[in-house]
Regions:
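Helix-loop-strand module that forms the ligand-binding subsite of alpha/beta enzymes
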Residues: 59-143
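N-terminal beta-loop-helix "entrance" segment that forms/cooperates
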Residues: 42-66
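Generic recognition of short, well-ordered alpha-helical segments
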Residues: 27-31, 56, 84-88, 168
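Short, solvent-exposed amphipathic alpha-helices that sit
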Residues: 27-38, 134-149
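N-terminal beta1-alpha1 ligand-phosphate binding loop
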Residues: 6-45, 177-178, 199
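Glycine-rich phosphate/pyrophosphate-binding loop and the adjoining helix
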Residues: 13, 33, 143-213
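Short beta-strand elements in bilobed, periplasmic/extracellular small-molecule ligand-binding domains
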Residues: 40-48, 153-158
Length: 213
């Protein structure tokens, strides 16, 4: 498993999952990943390097996540969602009885932050453009995943039009990202955010292992 931490000796409080299936073709996500590695207290996990065979070490991942106050999901938006390995990580690591449901309180009180890029410009996420919806329409799966696990879903940091962005635009965005990581949890807007809604899953809805709906 690949484990990378930023310089410094303070305890890890941020767990960042960097998920990109083709890093060699990445510019924006690669810059963001490398910037995160320079911030103290950030545990960076390059999912596609850690699990090229998609065999996720659930116990190890749960231990890393349990130590963190903030979970960061860093990835490109692909087909209006997350890369396949990031989705598999959620499916396997956020298990019933640990992350949610009866006895599943390991993540209560933590924060979840989406840091994502899109290939198309922001104006393409509009009812009159080819993506047909404002980008917020694609956020509910992220928001509800966090809520079901008792986490606050923080305002996402998005970089639209990553393919056509200038070097200056990318540098400015990476600086904002680095500053936010380094200053967490001292973000002014967090003081006004409401706590996570209660999402109680009754025992009758408990998923059974190896059983499909």
């Amino acid at each position: 498993m690949t484990t990378t931490t930023g310089p410094g000796s303070r305890p890890t409080s941020i767990y960042l999952l960097a998920a990109h299936p083709h890093w060699r073709d990445s510019r924006a996500n690669l810059a963001l990943r490398e910037a995160a590695r320079q911030v103290g207290g950030v545990d960076v996990n390059d999912l596609y390097a850690s699990y090229p065979d998609y065999a996720i070490d659930v116990e190890a991942e749960q231990a890393r996540l349990a130590r963190a106050d903030l979970l960061v999901l860093l990835h490109p938006i692909q087909w209006y969602s997350m890369p396949a390995l990031q989705k598999l990580w959620l499916d396997e690591v956020l298990s019933y009885g640990w992350a949610y449901g009866g006895g599943g309180s390991a993540l209560e009180g933590k924060d979840c932050w989406l840091v994502a890029t899109t290939g198309g410009p922001e104006k393409s996420y509009h009812p009159q453009s080819y993506n047909r919806y404002f980008f917020d329409a694609f956020l509910p799966p992220y928001e509800q995943t966090a809520a079901l696990c008792g986490m606050r879903f923080l305002p996402p940091l998005l970089f639209h039009g990553a393919r056509s962005a200038t070097d200056e635009e990318l540098v400015a965005h990476v600086e904002v990202f680095s500053d936010r990581l380094a200053s967490y949890p001292n973000w002014p807007e967090l003081e006004d955010m409401e706590g996570c809604p209660s999402c109680v899953v009754p025992a009758t809805d408990r998923p059974h292992e190896h059983e499909e709906a």
